[in-house]
């Protein structure tokens, strides 16, 4: 994508933004097909020209007869470049499965179909290329073979269109088939969070660093601040192009080129993400559902090292099977992926897994929590959470993530990331949870939310801690607010806010009493029995008799040299309860004397 100069902006909108990608075996004519459809030769590298194969991703745009414009991604077919194919396929809505009529179904045809299935692609057209090299009888045989191959897959009912890029035969029918299929693509729910997985980075003279990708959710505008994840580096959008046209904003589903202000090309690579500042949190653990492909060749054992491909990233990971020790071919299970480097993902992201060596596609799945903690294997509680996150409704998913977030709670933005629930739907869901007292709002500005059961458990922990303190120090009127907060592990900021809110709610319910900086249970009374009770009565009498000229604290301690510890405790109790009024450090008065 080229970037036009300022002043050449075009008003350019789409009703539905769709990206079509190619798939198929090496040298089956994918690039020639795209060139015939769009006029663009997507093989731009010298090595690609010399070898006659696609190595890197290629991009173009396709104008359909009805006026809709599709983004197009041309992917490599060679087995050595499948990782590039996965990066390109991650953002597509429909696939053009290309099969050469003179060769038929080949190994990468099968592997690419597996990858498209694992990535959740549900629509496509099947293109039989190079028909000028075969006769009609052979073409009919190939067509039947392809139909048999596609049976039971998402392409089973898709149109099969024979074409020749050399003669142009069949291309009108192909355009019509693409247009019909594009109209069947269901518009996915937009989470509202701007996210662009980077699949290409280059430097353009006069403009600087440009990144491209398919905008998976949200929107972005010229001048906005964005963050490069997982680096945490922030920069601004200098310019935007969609299908070679300069625009002010780009929306979910569009192939987009973004010119980044003052950013070195060397710091960005394919697999990084552009997102809103602070919107995404990189993690080295991902909870997921996993399917081991039929025909994967061998069982998947716990802790197997694999190559993980998600959106445009490739990263090494270990598969921790949580519900078994090994997974048969064709089997499904729950797993946690432990990554070798941080990755920013969102619940609902699909992934492909390839074996470490020999490198081949063996499975894939769906991320159900991109920010989990380490789990205990075979835990009934953990497996129940996984089942709810994988199969439950939005309310069940939100409840699990709220509980996992603990007493610190979670912001609405992070809840979107960890559940995959679109922003508007999540806001309605949370309002219902507040009304039903299943969630607690901590801060409306930040939209930080707590699980109601977790919050109730925390209030119970406050009461237990106070009870323990009262039992240990029966002569003390209460525990200092700061000591209680520290004991419960509630730090400054959010922790202090939630702690203060819990104290207020407990006081409102009549369960505790907060007096200045001292906190006590509502039913707590200092109980003085035996000698301590008698000592208190004697101390009270001394102060009553002294009236406005009572002895100093030092003088009283000198009268009871063997009971100074008890006297000091009694001073604390009597001043806390208001019987003695402290005027200065060494002087108290009885309340009846004032």
Model-flagged regions — what are they?
Residues 137, 148-296:
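Conserved catalytic-core segments of large NTP-driven translation/proteostasis enzymes
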Residues 78-79, 102-106, 130-135, 165-169, ...:
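Conserved nucleotide-binding/hydrolysis micro-motifs of P-loop NTPases
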């Amino acid at each position: 994508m080229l970037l036009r100069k300022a002043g050449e902006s075009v008003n350019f909108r789409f009703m539905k933004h769709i990206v079509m990608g190619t798939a198929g075996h090496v040298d089956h004519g994918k690039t020639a097909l795209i060139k015939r459809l769009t006029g663009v030769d997507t093989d731009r590298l010298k090595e690609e020209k010399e070898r006659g194969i696609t190595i890197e991703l290629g991009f173009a745009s396709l104008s359909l007869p009805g006026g809709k414009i599709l983004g197009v991604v041309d992917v490599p077919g060679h087995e050595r470049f499948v990782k590039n194919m996965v990066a390109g396929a991650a953002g597509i809505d429909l696939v053009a499965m290309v099969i050469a009529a003179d060769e038929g179904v080949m190994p990468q045809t099968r592997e690419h179909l597996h990858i498209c299935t694992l990535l959740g692609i549900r629509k496509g057209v099947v293109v039989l290329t190079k028909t000028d090299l075969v006769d009609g009888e052979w073409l009919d045989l190939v067509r039947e073979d392809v139909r048999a191959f596609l049976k039971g897959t998402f392409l089973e009912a898709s149109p099969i269109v024979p074409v020749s890029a050399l003669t142009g035969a069949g291309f009108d029918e192909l355009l019509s088939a693409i247009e019909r299929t594009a109209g069947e693509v269901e518009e996915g729910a937009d989470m509202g969070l701007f996210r662009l997985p980077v699949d290409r980075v280059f430097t353009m003279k006069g403009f600087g660093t440009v990144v491209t990708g398919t905008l998976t959710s949200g929107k972005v505008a010229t001048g906005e601040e964005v963050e490069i994840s997982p680096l945490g580096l922030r920069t601004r959008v200098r310019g935007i192009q969609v299908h070679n046209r300069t625009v002010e904003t780009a929306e979910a589903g569009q192939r987009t080129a973004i010119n980044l202000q003052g950013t070195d090309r060397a710091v960005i690579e394919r697999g990084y993400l552009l997102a809103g500042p602070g919107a995404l949190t990189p993690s080295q653990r991902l909870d997921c559902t996993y399917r081991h492909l039929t025909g994967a060749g061998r069982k998947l054992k716990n802790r197997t090292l694999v190559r993980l491909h998600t959106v445009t990233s490739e990263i090494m990971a270990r598969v921790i099977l949580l519900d078994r020790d090994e997974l048969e071919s064709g089997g499904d299970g729950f797993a946690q992926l432990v990554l070798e480097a941080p990755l920013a993902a969102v619940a609902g992201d699909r992934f492909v897994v390839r074996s470490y060596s020999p490198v081949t596609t063996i499975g894939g799945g769906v991320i159900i929590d991109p920010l989990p903690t380490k789990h205990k294997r075979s835990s009934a509680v953990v497996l129940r959470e996984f089942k709810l996150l994988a199969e439950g409704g939005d309310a069940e998913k939100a409840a699990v993530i709220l509980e996992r977030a603990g007493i610190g709670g979670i912001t609405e933005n992070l809840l979107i990331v960890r559940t995959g629930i679109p922003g508007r739907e999540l806001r309605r869901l949370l309002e219902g949870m507040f009304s039903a007292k299943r969630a607690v709002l901590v801060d409306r500005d930040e939209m930080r939310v707590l699980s109601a059961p977790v919050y109730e458990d925390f209030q119970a922990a406050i009461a237990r801690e106070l009870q323990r303190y009262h039992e240990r120090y029966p002569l003390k009127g209460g525990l200092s607010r700061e000591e209680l907060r520290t004991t419960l592990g509630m730090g400054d900021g959010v922790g202090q806010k939630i702690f203060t809110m819990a104290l207020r709610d407990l006081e409102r319910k009549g369960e505790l009493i907060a007096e200045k900086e001292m906190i006590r249970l509502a039913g707590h009374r200092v109980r003085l029995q035996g000698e301590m009770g008698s000592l208190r009565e004697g101390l009270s009498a001394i102060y009553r008799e002294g009236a406005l000229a009572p002895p100093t604290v030092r003088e009283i301690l000198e009268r009871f040299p063997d009971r100074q510890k008890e006297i000091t405790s009694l001073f604390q109790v009597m001043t806390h309860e208001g019987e003695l009024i402290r005027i200065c450090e060494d002087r108290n008065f009885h309340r009846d004397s004032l």
